[in-house]
């Protein structure tokens, strides 16, 4: 966005222009999302949207699909009009796309809104979101690829290809996603799911020994509700993550990136002191399938040589502890530190009691 003179344009304020620009940037936003980006009160946002719509600066349509789980009425979404884009351009905003360029099919709207919701949740924690248009253009990807965009973490050292999955996931869709992941340049992947069934479908497909996805970085599979919270304090935000680990009564001795010895075969997050023992600490709250894959090869002879157990941070949610124990049942030198997932919610201080599978 170019520097522009701060002034009123007709009956529109600078805040109104900025709101229109956010609609341009995100392509489509729900009423609740507009309240967030515009810092508007619950009731005032309706008044503001009605005002801008009556002036012809934006369009609204009903959301169809499964954007809001288990709810028949999905609400409305808004997008900027050609008149709105023209107004932004006249006032110094760098806007190259037309309203038709920004338009998204009704089928894809729930996916876009979900990605925007995740991006808005993570922005204050230092994450940066790039939508699918920008990613496909920058990395010369296929226009038909179904990745929703990318997320650059707070540490600025990982860029995740983002995939959004709803309650019903078809086998063909999973095969297509896996093909994209193997073909594209991203070494890190984040898949968010809605509902327990879709989570288990992704895990089963991605852990299939005949067609396993292997990347040099991370492949994280998380329920959407949990991802919005946990990623703000995960290892992708090192300072917050270390503080969270310390709150669990764990003393960090060394991070893997600064490890003094290359002998260990464990790719751990930290070397820690726990219950009077030195242990390799691995945070599996992120369900990183690459961490799990590597951990499966920390064999008995490696443990006997190193003399260190692995301390795995997990939770008592079904998408954590049971899954981890099932996959790692043959690795006997693991201590599981299971916490209530609401501890993550409390520490992150983002949302209260909600279904983390949503």
Enumerate the predicted regions with their spans.
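Electrostatic, structured charged patches in enzyme active sites and in nucleic-acid/phosphate-binding
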Residues: 110-358
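Nuclease-adjacent, charged terminal/linker segments that flank catalytic cores
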Residues: 1-108, 112-115, 121, 125, ...
């Amino acid at each position: 966005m170019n520097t522009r003179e701060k002034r009123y344009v007709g009956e529109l304020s600078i805040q109104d222009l900025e709101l229109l620009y956010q609609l341009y940037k995100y392509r489509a936003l729900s009423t609740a999302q507009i309240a967030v980006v515009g810092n508007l009160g619950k009731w005032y946002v309706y008044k503001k949207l009605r005002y801008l719509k009556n002036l012809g600066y934006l369009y609204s349509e009903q959301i169809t699909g499964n954007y809001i789980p288990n709810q028949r009425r999905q609400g409305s979404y808004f997008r900027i009009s050609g008149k709105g884009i023209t107004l932004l351009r006249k006032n110094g905003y760098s806007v190259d796309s037309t309203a038709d360029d920004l338009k998204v099919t009704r089928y894809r709207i729930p996916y876009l809104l979900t990605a925007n919701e995740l991006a808005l949740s993570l922005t204050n924690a230092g994450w940066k979101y790039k939508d699918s248009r920008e990613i496909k253009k920058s990395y010369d990807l296929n226009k038909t690829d179904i990745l929703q965009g990318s997320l650059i973490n707070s540490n600025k050292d990982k860029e995740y290809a983002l995939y959004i999955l709803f309650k019903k996931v078809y086998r063909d869709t999973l095969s297509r996603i896996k093909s994209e992941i193997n073909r594209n340049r991203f070494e890190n992947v984040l898949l968010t799911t809605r509902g327990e069934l879709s989570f288990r479908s992704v895990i089963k497909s991605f852990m299939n020994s005949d067609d396993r996805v292997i990347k040099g970085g991370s492949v994280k599979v998380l329920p959407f509700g949990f991802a919005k919270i946990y990623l703000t304090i995960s290892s992708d935000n090192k300072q917050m993550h270390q503080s969270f680990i310390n709150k669990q009564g764990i003393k960090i001795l060394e991070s893997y990136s600064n490890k003094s010895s290359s002998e260990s075969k464990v790719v751990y997050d930290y070397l820690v002191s726990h219950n009077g023992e030195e242990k390799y600490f691995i945070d599996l709250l992120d369900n990183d399938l690459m961490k799990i894959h590597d951990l499966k090869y920390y064999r008995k002879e490696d443990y006997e040589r190193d003399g260190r157990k692995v301390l795995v941070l997990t939770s008592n949610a079904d998408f954590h502890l049971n899954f981890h124990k099932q996959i790692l049942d043959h690795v006997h030198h693991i201590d599981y530190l299971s916490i209530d997932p609401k501890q993550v919610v409390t520490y992150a201080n983002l949302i209260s009691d909600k279904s983390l599978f949503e």
